[in-house]
Amino acid sequence: MGLKKACLTVLCLIVFCFGIFYTFDRVNQGERNAVSLLKDKLFNEEGEPVNLIFCYTILQMKVAERIMAQHPGERFYVVLMSENRNEKYDYYFNQIKDKAERAYFFHLPYGLNKSFNFIPTMAELKVKSMLLPKVKRIYLASLEKVSIAAFLSTYPDAEIKTFDDGTGNLIQSSSYLGDEFSVNGTIKRNFARMMIGDWSIAKTRNASDEHYTIFKGLKNIMDDGRRKMTYLPLFDASELKAGDETGGTVRILLGSPDKEMKEISEKAAKNFNIQYVAPHPRQTYGLSGVTTLNSPYVIEDYILREIKKNPHTRYEIYTFFSGAALTMKDFPNVHVYALKPASLPEDYWLKPVYALFTQSGIPILTFDDKD
């Protein structure tokens, strides 16, 4: 045990020294360094405990912002970890940063599981976790992320609250129902175990005493009787009234982060006379034959703004498997359709998603995706 502590101490010192490099690191918003955390540890240790919220996507940041609004006066530290960095991520990170006491953006362009990234990043996260003041609650959506376990294992007595990460919380094959973290390579697995001890996905799931869901009336994988389920409406369209739809029709295809969807998306756009594509926040490719909607807003926020400006326009939203279909289906003047390529086999992995759309009253439109 003495040797393990000594090794961890040396590791902490090394990572802390390298943390100085991030003091003026614009890529990480200048707050990935450990200086601010060290100040808290030294001077605010006896203050009010903090709440940690971990986010990996823009949707998760939206949920986190709503959770924070329910606890005015409490201290919140937000940690965003993402392989992506673009206008949308910056916009929503700055939104939540303004409402949190501290916010940290870990931009990991090559992903955490890359060999050269994993060990230094996990060590850095462990050091940062130990520099935090007292932690009261930890909120997270991505139960399968071993990076969060670096914090969970440091504060095993903190309350754990979970929240939705899109349709993954509505499908029984979700990775959130797994038991152990997926870490490739013996060296990385052993290092992860040193950083997180015996923490696991199952331990996180079982420790959660409350789950926030953004989907009303749909069976959630976290709704197993072990915890309180709290509905958290994410997008408020209550003040908008349905118009007579005499102002024309706007058809929008929701993009996908998967590059292999490019060709099939272009065929769908042509088949259904779709004029616009709303790129997925993690999408890096464009589509020909349609106009790209360049906006810092996610599609739900964008559409709500458009409805206010054009209350008599009919909006048709087309998607392959985006969870935004479920969050927008009840917006006034909005009609959502799920696209199903005819070439998909019956046992394709999207089958549960289409079943979910059907259950929610979203029409499934099959089209010929072959020339």
Curated annotation (Swiss-Prot):
UniProt-listed GO biological process terms: lipopolysaccharide biosynthetic process
The family database entries (Gene3D superfamilies) matched by this protein are listed as:
3.30.370.20
Quote the pathway field: Bacterial outer membrane biogenesis; lipooligosaccharide biosynthesis
Please tell me where CMP-N-acetyl-beta-neuraminate binds in this chain. 255, 278-282, 299-300, 322-323
* Entry EC number(s): 2.4.3.6
Per the record, its GO cellular-component terms are: cell outer membrane
Superkingdom of the source? Bacteria
Which reaction equation describes what this protein catalyses?
Answer: a beta-D-galactosyl-(1->4)-N-acetyl-beta-D-glucosaminyl derivative + CMP-N-acetyl-beta-neuraminate = an N-acetyl-alpha-neuraminyl-(2->3)-beta-D-galactosyl-(1->4)-N-acetyl-beta-D-glucosaminyl derivative + CMP + H(+)
What is the protein's membrane topology class? Answer: Peripheral membrane protein
The chain's coiled-coil residues are: none
Q: Give the UniProt keywords, A-Z.
A: Cell outer membrane, Glycosyltransferase, Lipopolysaccharide biosynthesis, Membrane, Transferase
Q: Which residues form the active site?
A: 258 (proton acceptor), 280 (proton donor)
Concerning InterPro entries, the annotation shows: Glyco_transf_52
Compartments reported by the entry: Cell outer membrane
A Gene Ontology MF term for this entry? Answer: N-acetyllactosaminide alpha-2,3-sialyltransferase activity
Instruction: Report the family membership.
Output: Belongs to the glycosyltransferase 52 family.
Q: What does this protein do?
A: Catalyzes the transfer of sialic acid from the substrate CMP-N-acetylneuraminate to the terminal galactose residue of the lacto-N-neotetraose branch of surface lipooligosaccharide (LOS), forming an alpha-2,3-sialyl linkage. Thus, functions in the sialylation of LOS, which plays a role in the evasion of the host immune response by protecting N.meningitidis from complement-mediated serum killing and from phagocytic killing by neutrophils.
How it assembles, according to the record, is: Homodimer.
Q: What is this protein called?
A: N-acetyllactosaminide alpha-2,3-sialyltransferase
To which species is this protein native?
Answer: Neisseria meningitidis serogroup A / serotype 4A (strain DSM 15465 / Z2491)
Q: What is the lineage of its organism?
A: Bacteria, Pseudomonadati, Pseudomonadota, Betaproteobacteria, Neisseriales
Gene encoding it? lst
